[in-house]
């Protein structure tokens, strides 16, 4: 049901390691494709002015905070997740430190916002746990 994703990776690493190191200085909005798909369909189906609309979940967090939330949802100690800086985790492409997008245009045209990322996280973790049994 869910392809490869951060939640599955954290769940797998939780079973393999005592601690997991995750970047703590990049802030974003975890967003699920099921929510984004609904949002895109709603925007395309509505008579809204041409322009840019940000389809991201409510709320913001760091990758570190997201990983801690995954551990919490799994019933594991979130202090098993250790914060590291972007400099300590080399990636092939640079990532922005702050990639939170506003929803002003969405609100202005009456399109429903995406749910808070923690709502979908709880559902996803339940699915991941069910699928691994």
Give residue ranges: language-model regions.
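C-terminal amphipathic/interface module of NAD(P)-dependent oxidoreductases
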Residues: 94-133
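Hydrophobic "lid"/C-terminal helical patch
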Residues: 10, 40-44, 67-70, 103, ...
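Non-catalytic, hydrophobic alpha-helical segments
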Residues: 36, 40, 55, 66, ...
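Short, surface-exposed alpha-helical segments at coil->helix boundaries
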Residues: 4-8, 64, 68, 100
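Mid/C-terminal beta-alpha module of Rossmann-like enzyme folds, strongest
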Residues: 39, 46-93, 133
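NAD(P)-dependent short-chain dehydrogenase/reductase
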Residues: 1-28, 34-35
């Amino acid at each position: 049901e869910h392809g490869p994703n951060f939640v599955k990776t954290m769940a797998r690493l939780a079973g393999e390691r005592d601690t997991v190191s995750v970047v703590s200085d990049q802030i974003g909005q975890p967003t699920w494709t099921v929510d984004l798909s609904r949002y895109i369909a709603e925007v395309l189906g509505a008579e809204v002015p041409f322009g840019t609309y940000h389809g991201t979940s409510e709320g913001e967090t760091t990758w570190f905070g997201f990983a801690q939330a995954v551990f919490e949802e799994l019933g594991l100690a979130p202090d098993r997740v250790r914060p590291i800086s972007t400099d300590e985790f080399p990636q092939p492409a640079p990532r922005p430190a702050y990639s939170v997008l506003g929803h002003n245009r969405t609100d202005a045209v009456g399109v429903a916002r995406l749910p808070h990322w923690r709502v979908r996280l709880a559902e996803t973790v339940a699915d991941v746990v069910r699928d691994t049994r």
